[in-house]
From Swiss-Prot:
It catalyses: 4-CDP-2-C-methyl-D-erythritol 2-phosphate = 2-C-methyl-D-erythritol 2,4-cyclic diphosphate + CMP. Signal peptide: none annotated. SUPFAM superfamilies: IpsF-like (SSF69765). GO terms for molecular function: 2-C-methyl-D-erythritol 2,4-cyclodiphosphate synthase activity; metal ion binding. A divalent metal cation binds at D17, H19, H57. Its EC number is 4.6.1.12. The keyword NADP does not apply. The keyword Lyase applies. Its cofactor is a divalent metal cation. It comes from Ehrlichia ruminantium (strain Welgevonden). The record marks H49, T148 as: Transition state stabilizer. It comes from the Bacteria. Homotrimer. This is 2-C-methyl-D-erythritol 2,4-cyclodiphosphate synthase.
């Protein structure tokens, strides 16, 4: 605990998101999915109410959890037309504002994208810098990584994509 307040100096949050892919294999070269703000050419689309960016959804969820503000689903429900096709950076920006209102900054973020395809790591650095552009997080404190499920389960059958994020929030001075 800080000497000067009753709020903890550090708080940790974890977030998770998953979305299904459509079952249509699109031969259209303009087909893409958005992960951590970066468009990636892919022959399937993500089924979602917003832009379906699992990486940014997990990040927003982690930030909200760290500062005790519930979940992304509570703040941006998929039943609200306001969020239809919304860009997920908005969710992260709003979550960061809630953290700041409670006296915290985001010190570190670690995001893992879980899918068989498409390959994520060629875009990791671009994703890291994109997230740094609209958050207070230094790019060197944003980590993007990817894994597969070794072809196990729905994600292993390439039916969808998931992400987990963990953040460390520090008390502002």
């Amino acid at each position: 605990m800080s000497k000067h307040t009753n709020i903890p100096m550090f708080r940790i949050g974890i977030g998770y998101d998953v979305h299904r892919f459509d079952n249509i294999n699109n031969d259209d070269s303009n087909t893409s999915i958005t992960i951590c703000g970066i468009k990636i050419n892919y022959h399937k689309k993500i089924i979602a109410h917003s832009d379906g960016d699992v990486g940014l959804h997990a990040l927003a969820d982690a930030i909200l959890g760290a500062v005790g503000c519930g979940s992304i689903g509570q703040h941006f429900p998929n039943t609200d037309k306001k969020w239809k096709n919304a860009e997920s950076s908005h969710f992260v920006i709003e979550a960061q504002k809630k953290a700041q209102e409670r006296g915290y900054i985001i010190s570190n973020a670690d995001i893992i994208i879980i899918c068989e395809q498409p390959k994520i790591m060629p875009y990791a650095l671009e994703m890291q810098h994109y997230i740094a552009q609209f958050t207070s997080i230094d790019p060197s404190f944003i980590n993007i990584k990817a894994t597969t499920t070794e072809k196990l389960g729905a994600i292993g059958r390439n039916e969808g994509i998931a992400a987990q994020a963990i953040v460390l929030c520090s008390q502002q001075y």
